[in-house]
Amino acid sequence: MGEAWELSVEPDFPSRIVDGPTLDEVLRADPALLGKEAPLGSTALLVKLIDAADDLSVQIHPSDTDPALAAEESGKPEAWYIIGAEPGSGLYLGFRDGVSRQDIEMAIDREGAVDALMSFVPVSPGDLFLIEPGTPHAIGKGVLLLEPQRVSPGKRGITYRYWDWNRRYDATGRLDPGGKARAIHRERALSVTSWDGPRGDALLERVRHRAGPAAKDGTASLETLVGDCAPIGSEVFFLQRLAGSGDLALPADDRLRSLTVLDGGVTLHDGDTVLELARGQTAALPACLGPLRVELDVAHAMLCTLA
């Protein structure tokens, strides 16, 4: 599995300005960069790129209001935007209808197949999912995605591991049938699961939007995928997709934003200041920026903002 933390203020994996200090140091030194987030001291936005070469472990995140969280811990709501997917690949999202807590306990304790008790969702480029607290989930082999998350500044986003495909590893972390299993957070995972929430098709209707592949060969466009008046509403994220070739105007915003280029090229124009971005690069757009002229070159990019 390949994982890149594109925009992060977490102490263990901080983003760093090119040839400069960490992003967290820059934001804490100038509250104007944060806009609405200034009272927090830094940003709660965390953006990752994940390329799953194998099935990832089944995980779950608690809500921010979970009473079991320590003072230094935070919930971690997230979204998944599918960039690429091999034929037959997909996600595991929630338990299937009729699966009980006792069924999951037995599967874990007997080293059974927890994946057989989950809803498998085939995916295509352009699919977008909101992963709500209390929803068991896993990224399947062959999926490449962008993952924006919200983690309270100065705190550690919490993930509980439900199941890891009964794999074992040697001391270096390589697969080894004679090695040790990774830690499973059985009781905590079970306790934060939304057992009475929607499952299957009912869950997908609430959390999935199939936007289709980005129109890289068309004229420049800016499409809101998550947010007000968008296909999916969210109290956490505001997500937009840029695609095509040509110029477009990006309005000012009073929030810090993350722009990640997924394909092609993107050039940002702020008066006489020009910033060129290539595939795989991410720019943090401060809240104090005015309107920008964005030049797209057969581009596909995602703009991530906290609501």
List each model region and its residues:
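Glycine- and acidic-residue-biased ligand/ion/polar-headgroup-sensing regions
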Residues: A52-D55, E73-A107, G142, G244-G271
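Ligand-binding loop in jelly-roll beta-barrel domains
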Residues: D51-D55, D64, S74, A85-G88, ...
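Basic, glycine-rich polyanion-binding accessory segments appended to enzymes
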Residues: E205-A252, R257, D263-G264
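Short acidic-glycine-tyrosine-enriched beta hairpin
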Residues: M118-L130, G271-L289
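Transition-metal
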Residues: M1-S100, D164-K216, L239
